[in-house]
C-alpha cells in the first residue's frame, strides 16, 4: 500500500445530495495539488474513492452511509440468462480504445444521452465545457472505449485502467437503441476486458439501496460491497 498517511484530504461543506434529495452530503477530496499517481489512485479505490475530472473523492457524510462502494470480481463473475442475451444481442459491435479527446461525435452522443435519460439530474443541460471538464482529461490511465456498429458510434465507456482493476468512470450511449441495453453491455464488456488484462475487478462506483437508478449494479453477481472498511461478497 502507498503511504496514504502522507496525503492531505479536504472535506466540502454540506450540500444537497445528488442521489437522495432529502439528504445533505459531504464529500472528501484528495488534495488537488497532489499529482494524480496511478498507484495512489489504485490504493484509494480500495478505500472507496472515485475519480471525477481531475479529482479523487468519496462520500464523507456525518449522518448517512447510504453510498456503498461496489466492485465486480472479474474472475468469479457468472452472467445470468438476461446478461447472456445482452451479450449475444450486441455481438455485432466492435470496440476500440481511444485516448481522451473532445470530438463533436462524442459530444453529440453525450448530449442526446443526457437529454433523454438524465434530464432530471444535475448534469442537465449538457454543455461542451461540462463534457470536457468531466470526461476529457489528459491522464495516462484513462481510456475512451468506443462501441460501434458498422462505423456508427453507439456508446462510449470512459474507464481508468488501474493496477488493481478497471474503474468505470462513466458510460454514455445511443438512447434510441434501448433494446440493446447498451449500458449493461458496456459493463459486461468491461468485465471481459478486465479478465483479458488479468485485472482483479471492475469498480462500479457507489450503490445506493434506495436509489432506483443504482439498482442495476447488484444484478452482477457476485458483487463486492465495501462495508465497515471491508469488501464483503454478495452472491
Curated annotation (Swiss-Prot):
Reactions catalysed: N-terminal L-glutamyl-[protein] + L-leucyl-tRNA(Leu) = N-terminal L-leucyl-L-glutamyl-[protein] + tRNA(Leu) + H(+); N-terminal L-aspartyl-[protein] + L-leucyl-tRNA(Leu) = N-terminal L-leucyl-L-aspartyl-[protein] + tRNA(Leu) + H(+)
Highest taxon of the lineage: Bacteria
Keyword field: Acyltransferase, Cytoplasm, Transferase
Compartment(s) where it occurs, according to its Swiss-Prot or TrEMBL record: Cytoplasm
InterPro entries listed in its UniProt record: Acyl_CoA_acyltransferase (IPR016181), Asp_Glu_LeuTrfase (IPR017138), N-end_Aminoacyl_Trfase (IPR030700), N-end_Aminoacyl_Trfase_C (IPR007472), N-end_Aminoacyl_Trfase_N (IPR007471)
EC number: 2.3.2.29
Matches recorded under Pfam families: ATE_C (PF04377), ATE_N (PF04376)
GO BP term (any one): ubiquitin-dependent protein catabolic process via the N-end rule pathway
GO cellular component terms listed in the entry, alphabetical order: cytoplasm
Gene Ontology MF, one: leucyl-tRNA--protein transferase activity
UniProt-listed HAMAP family: Bpt
Function: Functions in the N-end rule pathway of protein degradation where it conjugates Leu from its aminoacyl-tRNA to the N-termini of proteins containing an N-terminal aspartate or glutamate.
Similarity comment: family membership: Belongs to the R-transferase family. Bpt subfamily.
Protein name (record): Aspartate/glutamate leucyltransferase
Source organism: Pseudomonas putida (strain ATCC 47054 / DSM 6125 / CFBP 8728 / NCIMB 11950 / KT2440)
Lineage, top ranks: Bacteria, Pseudomonadati, Pseudomonadota, Gammaproteobacteria, Pseudomonadales
